[in-house]
Regions:
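Conserved N-terminal entry element of GNAT/NAT acetyltransferase domains
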Residues: 1-15, 150
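Acetyl-CoA-dependent GNAT
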Residues: 11-88, 99-101, 105
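Short hydrophobic/aromatic beta-strand or adjacent loop that forms the aromatic wall/cage
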Residues: 56, 143-148
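Conserved active-site alpha-helix within GNAT-family acetyltransferase domains
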Residues: 92, 96-97, 117-134, 140-144
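Conserved GNAT acetyl-CoA-binding A-motif
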Residues: 105-117
Length: 152
């Protein structure tokens, strides 16, 4: 599936911080409406700066309306921490484009955790060749998660 209107993938740059953090909030709020993600923005911003930017390659998807998605991949370990797409852009092929970029960056394989009740994400990953390899609890949220893995 190709996104339309066209998007451009590019490396994250420091001026992208505010729009990517807001995109994270909006996307997760849509996925879990009963959780107040506005109250978690400061935590996410700290994690973004201290953990993800320090260890991951971040690629943003940009359309005419601005940043519409991003993916974070630790290329040393193949860990995919986040694929986030603007809710109004779901179904446009942006997640597929970001996943293809993640695979290009980590050709030996990708590993991730996904909330067990995030059925939309689980279907997406399964459709794209990921298998569940275990279950555990997220150490921060305490939510049950699947460990999923993709190998070429």
């Amino acid at each position: 599936m190709t996104p339309d209107p066209p998007i451009r993938l590019r490396r994250y740059a420091p001026p992208d911080e505010a729009p990517t953090i807001e995109l994270w909030r909006r996307s997760w709020q849509q996925t879990y409406p009963s959780i107040d993600f506005s109250a978690r923005v400061a935590w996410w911003q700290e994690r973004w700066r201290q953990e993800l930017l320090a260890s991951a390659t971040v690629t943003v998807a940009e359309g005419a309306e601005g940043i519409v998605g991003f993916v974070t991949v630790d290329t040393a370990t193949g860990y995919l921490d986040q694929i986030v797409v603007a809710p109004e852009s779901w179904g446009r092929g942006i997640a597929e484009a970001l996943l293809a970029e993640a695979r290009r960056q980590s050709p030996r394989g990708l590993d991730l955790h996904v909330n067990i009740d995030n059925h939309r994400a689980i279907r997406f990953y399964q459709k794209h060749g990921f298998c569940t390899v275990g279950d555990e609890l997220n150490p921060i949220s305490g939510r049950p998660v699947h460990r999923m893995s993709w190998r070429p």
